[in-house]
């Protein structure tokens, strides 16, 4: 009997490796791993999928697409979920889902499987994205169905010849892409515990960072980072280089108790050295170039966009509309930001732009001042007129 095909989002870890064996009972498994800049041994992952029973194994480099179509939205949208989390994992899920659906269409598969548990956000992100792209596709979540303990899963793996990962004893659950690294579980589950140094990988402890700062110039064109210290680079490469440079100076550590979509609170440790640096730089160029009303309104859009992406609604019309609005604001965001990296901080210390709305002759308090201070008298009268009228009415009522 010919089996149906299932497309499995494969990471090379224990959960998705066991899933191949488990799914093989009813399906021919096509394993797909997306390279979003996590730095894993992709050849090993490719071969491991075949070794444990997949009929096909695909490793797809999507770093550039991820950076240009997803990360750039987060950068230009200053998307911090709950004002702290730069949407590391949440950004990669819609792209991974899109690629899984494309491969399902190419291979004739009618089912997609993922390795998410039943208490995390990612199950929602994957399944809502897949349903948004092709409602006819069926989704299987083996880990959610098993409800096995870790010990039961290991026993199943041993009984079925699934290699046990060397890092299985690690207490942490880690997800990483070029925008950052997310870490949870183990000692981190108690929010009173300070995260130990072994919970970090991309950054040095700020107190152990170099005693001298380093400065980096970041060039932007239409809101897109295009160069570091004058060197033109693809966005993905630029982010990865900043991850290394800013990480050496302890930049980008985030300790966050967040409200998950599924209704629980979770303590997460994030490392986002490149993201934190770029977000600071981009914001400063916007501060130079956006008119006041837009600068004041845009954060409202940013907050709503952050929530939509975090909650797995990338392909929702509301998200698409907000992204379109966001893009319309970026044509004037051109210039250079100089960022000082020093012991855990990324501080913009200088900025310039040909589109700058900063007029030094208006801002200065020297003799070069061109601001007409006499105009302030009439402006204040008109601006304060509603408040004055209100006060007069209240005073009349109080008599």
Swiss-Prot record:
Protein name from the UniProt record: Argininosuccinate synthase
Record family assignment: Belongs to the argininosuccinate synthase family. Type 1 subfamily.
Oligomeric form and interacting partners: Homotetramer.
Gene, per the UniProt record: argG
Top EC class, one word: ligase
Ligase listed as a keyword: yes
Primary location: cytoplasm
Organism in which the protein naturally occurs: Streptococcus gordonii (strain Challis / ATCC 35105 / BCRC 15272 / CH1 / DL1 / V288)
InterPro entries documented for this protein: Arginosuc_syn_C (IPR048268), Arginosuc_syn_N (IPR048267), Arginosuc_synth (IPR001518), Arginosuc_synth_CS (IPR018223), Arginosuc_synth_type_1_subfam (IPR023434), AS_cat/multimer_dom_body (IPR024074), Rossmann-like_a/b/a_fold (IPR014729)
